[in-house]
Amino acid sequence: MNRKTLLVIFFVTLLIAEEVNSFRLGGFLKKIWRSKLVKRLRSKGKQLLKEALAPEPAPEPAPEPAPEAAPEAAPEPAAAAPERRRRR
């Protein structure tokens, strides 16, 4: 099961247990707030909020590529063919 399904089952179970024991809503909210699952969700939310509000670090400049060594006896490129004139 995914986390959303487990979270829904958790809340429904707490709601049923609270309704059976008493009708006070404050105790139910207190129980939810102190539960381990909600503590984890709060800590993850705080962490995501810190990451979202933190300034982004400036990207480091990419290292310049090393110049390639030219081959010693490179043949001259063939003479470029003359360009043809276009008709107007």
UniProtKB/Swiss-Prot annotation:
Propeptide residues per the UniProt entry: 23-45
Signal listed as a keyword: yes
Keyword terms of this UniProt record: Cleavage on pair of basic residues, Repeat, Secreted, Signal
Localization annotation: Secreted
Tissue specificity note: Expressed by the venom gland.
Signal peptide: 1-22
Region of interest called Disordered, as start-end residue ranges on this chain: 49-88
Annotated PAPE repeat ranges: 57-60, 61-64, 65-68
Biased composition (Pro residues): 56-68
GO CC annotations on file: extracellular region
Protein name as catalogued: Pape peptide
Species, as recorded: Tityus serrulatus
Lineage: Eukaryota, Metazoa, Ecdysozoa, Arthropoda, Chelicerata
